[in-house]
Amino acid sequence: MMKIGALLPRSTFQPLLHHNFQQGMQAYLQYRQVPAELITAHIGFGTEPEKVLAEAEKMLLEQQVDVLVLYADQDAVQNIASLARSLNRLVLLVHNGAKYPYNWEPHPVVLSHTLNNTIQCRLTGQYAAGLLKDAAVCTSFYDGGYSHCHALTQSYMDNGGNIAYNFVSQYKVQEFNSTPLHDFLKANTHVQALLSLFNGDLAHCFLQQLQQQDIAKDLQVFASPMLLDETLPAVYGELRLPFRISGYVPWTSSIDNNANRLLKTQFLHSTGREANLAGMHGWDTALILEHIFNTADQHRFRAKDILAGLDGITFDSPRGPLRMDTATHHMLAPAWLVQANEVLEQEVTGRVDDTAKTWQEILNDKTIATATGWINTYLCA
């Protein structure tokens, strides 16, 4: 039997984040009948490094887990990685991938299994620049504090786009007021592209206020993955969008492959609910954990041997082929271009299979070697 430790976060933006992620893991492990014990603990927003380290120490030293799943992307994760290195135990980092890699990566015992948001935002910026050359950037004080904002806007400008206006909202719905943005768009009708990054209730509020404007029908919204969250209408209320909204995402329920159909069937069977992004991420994580269990005779749960054994392995993920980039120990999957209709239902209109090329562009961009921003994991605030 494999013993899995999972340190899970809290999120006010996405209250069910940890729950959905855990249910996705459990749904896959149960479906595949993987003999595994899952031990969980909660680390809040992950902004207290001592607390997170203490929970990791308990799992690695006292409970002696074979693999530690850690939902976090703070720089302080390095302290846990150092502990795991001394024990030669694998840390499987999971998060949205909204930040650029740290300068201590790659780490010899860390595998980063993210949703690759910086890759998708970079691709969306390029896509937007190919259609419209003048844009307004729309984000919140919170969402704009992560690298995915730079990935979206910089790639737009690098491909000939001009940013004519920046709208940065407060991060509470009660204080959300997009009137300055609407006034700008009415006075500058040549600006029809909106590079937009919001999540949760702010995403819904942004779309709801925008759809009520007379100018809305002339606009095109190029969205971050969390703004294209399919669950927004069900959670926060119906939308009737008169404008086109599109962008690259890590996953959408309409992906037509066998692995995604299996995810949707088994998640519904296990939970009684439709599959969602966090649930898919948990399912995907368990896919990797199953491989680690099945190859245990070769590596005996030694982290460095596990990582060496992943070289050249392709997983059949609901997202498409999932592989490790050996140079950085980051898992990479295709990016899906979607266009949403008036009620935010999504249609896949394109895909980029070779996201390793975009990932390498990010790594090669020397202007982003040092980045500032929020210390907590994206969505975990």
Language-model features, listed with the residues they occupy:
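Short beta-strand segments enriched in small/hydrophobic residues
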Residues: M1-N20, L29-Q33, K133-T139
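Beta-alpha junction/loop-to-helix N-cap segments that form part of ligand/metal-binding clefts
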Residues: N20-F21, Y31, P35-K99
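Short beta-strand elements in bilobed, periplasmic/extracellular small-molecule ligand-binding domains
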Residues: Y31-T47, P108-V109, M157-S178, A193
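Periplasmic-binding protein-like
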Residues: L61-D73, L92-V94, A136-T139, T189-F206, ...
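Extracytoplasmic ligand/sensor domains, especially the bilobed periplasmic-binding protein
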Residues: V67-G161, Q220, E230-Y236
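Extracellular/periplasmic periplasmic-binding protein-like sensory domains
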Residues: L210-W283, A296-D297
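Short, charged, surface-exposed loops that flank catalytic or proteolytic processing sites
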Residues: N294-G309
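Solvent-exposed, acidic/polar segments of extracytosolic/periplasmic ligand-binding ectodomains
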Residues: P318-A381
